[in-house]
Amino acid sequence: MYIIIVSLADPVSRAFLELMGDLPLVETRGDLEIRRLRDTPVVVYRGEPTSFDKEDVLLSVGKHAVFISRHEMANPRPIFTVHTPGSWPDVSVSNPHLASAVLRALCNRLYEPFECAYEATHHTPNTAHISATFVEVGSTDREWGDRKAVGTLLEALEEVLNSPLEEHTPAMVIGDLHYTTVKESALRKEVDIGHVVPKYVEITPAAVETALRKHTVPIKRAILFRKNVKNPARGEILQMLRDRGVEVVLKG
């Protein structure tokens, strides 16, 4: 079962919660409220999305968490983003089919001046059992409080959570930019993207192996940007992936 997590310290979460209307309260667990949007549990959390540390509560209500969050960037522009969280070298469990379905639903609803992107794995929380997907609106106060933008996110999410998930080749990306250049492959339904190991982190065999393991489904394809992954680590990573039966696509 899916779980939507809204954080009262986050402006996009607050706008999202308001747009959902009156949600029946199911129960209270400490400082968490568990409400319901039709058949989907909605966990209301008082802190920041990146500070969420109540995975034990999530385990009792579902398996796949979707965090509603604001997006910030150095050069702000209107954008919808999707990504799996993780503070390297550890990461959360990634759900490639879910994350890519949400990306497609958002991109299909784009309107000017917004764009859409799939981001590299970054920031906490790091989940151990529950898959985590961040869905974000960026990148300034104007967009965070924009009811049309947040409503677009809500519509896209409802479409995905209330429909059977399409399943395309599960893939991870190694050594790409923060805003992955592989997004178009996901939009064309050639792959479903899980973890993206960005070029700016220390890319070690151990970190890649952890990311490979922490997916809801076995990864069938790894897209590796060889210029951004230096030897001897690159050779060890390639061997590890091939030993596990993962198809490797080299770029750059």
UniProtKB/Swiss-Prot annotation:
<keyword id="KW-0862">Zinc</keyword>
<dbReference type="InterPro" id="IPR018033">
    <property type="entry name" value="Deacylase_DtdA_archaea"/>
</dbReference>
<keyword id="KW-0378">Hydrolase</keyword>
<dbReference type="Pfam" id="PF04414">
    <property type="entry name" value="tRNA_deacylase"/>
</dbReference>
<protein>
    <recommendedName>
        <fullName>D-aminoacyl-tRNA deacylase</fullName>
        <ecNumber>3.1.1.96</ecNumber>
    </recommendedName>
</protein>
<dbReference type="GO" id="GO:0008270">
    <property type="term" value="F:zinc ion binding"/>
</dbReference>
<comment type="function">
    <text>D-aminoacyl-tRNA deacylase with broad substrate specificity. By recycling D-aminoacyl-tRNA to D-amino acids and free tRNA molecules, this enzyme counteracts the toxicity associated with the formation of D-aminoacyl-tRNA entities in vivo.</text>
</comment>
<dbReference type="GO" id="GO:0019478">
    <property type="term" value="P:D-amino acid catabolic process"/>
</dbReference>
<keyword id="KW-0479">Metal-binding</keyword>
<comment type="similarity">
    <text>Belongs to the DtdA deacylase family.</text>
</comment>
<dbReference type="GO" id="GO:0051499">
    <property type="term" value="F:D-aminoacyl-tRNA deacylase activity"/>
</dbReference>
<dbReference type="InterPro" id="IPR007508">
    <property type="entry name" value="DtdA"/>
</dbReference>
<comment type="subunit">
    <text>Monomer.</text>
</comment>
